[in-house]
Structure formats: C-alpha cells, structure tokens
Amino acid sequence: MIKNIFFIMFFLTSLTLKVNAACDDLPEDGVVYSGCAFADSQDLSSSYLPNADMTFVSFIGVIFNKSIMLNSRMDNSQFPESSWVRSNLYESSMQNSNFEDSDFTSANLHKVSFRGSSLLNVNFSKALMTEVDLTGANIQGAVFDQTLLGNAIFPDGTKCAVDSVGECKKMK
C-alpha cells in the first residue's frame, strides 16, 4: 500500500515537473510554451522560434523585434502592448488572441491568420500583410500606413485587391 502511494506521488510529481519545464525552455525551433504565463515586458528580440507552440500563453508587453517565428501557433493567447517590429511571422496562426496596442511595424505577416483576434490600436505600418486573414477581428484604431494588403481578407469578409496599399481596395 505504501509502495503504491509512493509510486503515485512520484508519478504526479514527475508530470508537474515536465509541464513546468517547458515554460523554462530556451527559445528554439519547435519549442512548446503552450499554457505558460510569462513575466511582463520581457525582451526577446532576435529570437529564433519557428514552428513554436505558444497557444494559451500570456506575454504582456513582450518585445519580439527582429524575431523569426515562421509557422508558429499563438492562438487564444494574450500579447497586449507587445512589439513585433521587423519580425518574420510568415504563415503563423494568431487566432482569437489579444494584440491590443501592439506594434507590427515592417513585420512580415504574409499568410498570417488573425481570425477573431483583438487588434485595437495596433500599428501595422509598412508591414507585409498579403493574404492575411482578419475575418472577425477587431481592427478599430489600427494603423495601416504603407502596409501591403494584397489579397488580405478584412473582418467583414472583404477581399482586398492585389494593389491594396495602406487601405483595402475591394476586389472587382
């Protein structure tokens, strides 16, 4: 009986350690941070995080400037007041997440999905947003100065013409 209790306690402890260990892993290709809550305002500039799983995370005020995060998953997460200047987020999924008051200036957002996300007051100036999906997203107050929006889908389902820059010209 005592042996069984000891085994169960050891098993549960090892599971807990494995879950927490992922949150402490260094940024790298394919890292899994799913469900982690991080300290506010971390500077992770120039991070290499392609194929990362950052679903259900909290990263308030994080700085990911000049980071490479191709094909990463950041769905259902909290990234308000974050900075992604000149980051490469090609084909990433950022659905149903909070990016309010964030800065994506000059970021590569080609084929990124922001479906259902809160993008209030986000700066997308000079970003590459071709084929971006903003279906159901809240883009109130968002800035698109000199942003390439060819074939982007806006929140109301409008598909932008290929030559859309700074504003979505409805496809003919």
Residue ranges and their predicted role:
Residues 4-5, 19:
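Hydrophobic alpha-helical segments, especially transmembrane helices
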Residues 5-13:
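Sec-dependent N-terminal signal peptides
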Residues 15-21:
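Sec/Tat signal peptide C-region and signal peptidase I cleavage site
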Residues 21-172:
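Tandem repeat scaffolds
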